[in-house]
Structure formats: structure tokens, C-alpha cells
Amino acid sequence: MPTISQLVGSERKRLTKKTKSPALKACPERRGVCTRVYTSTPKKPNSALRKVARVRLTSGFEVTAYIPGIGHNLQEHSVVLLRGGRVKDLPGVRYHIIRGTLDTAGVKDRRQSRSKYGAKAPKD
């Protein structure tokens, strides 16, 4: 606790909160263009080929984003929409691509949690 004379000398410093997704620049989503689509292996103890894309954003940043769901249609020059949200077992991946928007197709034959994967309601 500072004394009165310490407060006279200099005011209290405001604590600045560090954002977990700086490339979004305080926006909920950001548009970008895929520069590279590839697979990456997760940290120990997990094992898989996670689908990720390097994306150049309208904010000027180039970030790595995760492609959720089974199967995707993304390739270089695809226009995608990004949201925040890291992938715990992929270091450096702090963004998710939103399925079912712009050039990203929704997950085919998805029946549960459809809204998260841009899948339309089944016909039957």
C-alpha cells in the first residue's frame, strides 16, 4: 500500500490486460487469405496429424490457424474467417477457422454440434 506522499509523487499504474489473440485487434472475427495449408503434429503425449493453415489477415498479421472438423476444402488463396481460441496441444496455434463461412465449407454429414461446424440440418 503506497503512502500519501508516494501517491503525490506518482499516480497508481493501471494494470494492462494482455490479449490472448492480438492479431484480431479487439474484433470478434477477422478475414484472411490462406498462404499455406498443411498438417502438424501435436505435443507429447498426443499423436495425430492436425490440419492447420497459415493465414494472412486483413489486420496485416500472418498467423497459424486450426481447421476444426473432419475433412476440409481449403487450399492456398482460400478466403477464410478467423476467431480466437487456441489449440492446447499445438504450440503457436491461437486461432480457429470458422467453418461454413466464405470459402470454408461446413463439415459434411455432421449431426451433432452442427452450428460449430457450419453444417446444415439433415434432410430426413
UniProtKB/Swiss-Prot annotation:
GO molecular function, one term: rRNA binding
Top-rank taxon, per record: Bacteria
Start and end residues of each stretch annotated as Disordered: 1-26, 104-124
One Pfam entry name: Ribosom_S12_S23
InterPro entries (alphabetical): NA-bd_OB-fold, Ribosomal_uS12, Ribosomal_uS12_bac
PROSITE patterns, alphabetized: RIBOSOMAL_S12
Residues bearing the modification 3-methylthioaspartic acid: 89
One Gene Ontology biological process: translation
TM helices/strands, residue ranges: none
Keyword entries, A-Z: Methylation, Ribonucleoprotein, Ribosomal protein, RNA-binding, rRNA-binding, tRNA-binding
GO annotation, cellular component aspect: small ribosomal subunit
Subunit structure: Part of the 30S ribosomal subunit. Contacts proteins S8 and S17. May interact with IF1 in the 30S initiation complex.
UniProt record similarity statement: Belongs to the universal ribosomal protein uS12 family.
Main function: With S4 and S5 plays an important role in translational accuracy. Interacts with and stabilizes bases of the 16S rRNA that are involved in tRNA selection in the A site and with the mRNA backbone. Located at the interface of the 30S and 50S subunits, it traverses the body of the 30S subunit contacting proteins on the other side and probably holding the rRNA structure together. The combined cluster of proteins S8, S12 and S17 appears to hold together the shoulder and platform of the 30S subunit.
NCBIfam families from the UniProt entry: rpsL_bact
Annotated protein name in UniProt: Small ribosomal subunit protein uS12
Annotated organism of origin: Prochlorococcus marinus (strain AS9601)
Gene name of the record: rpsL
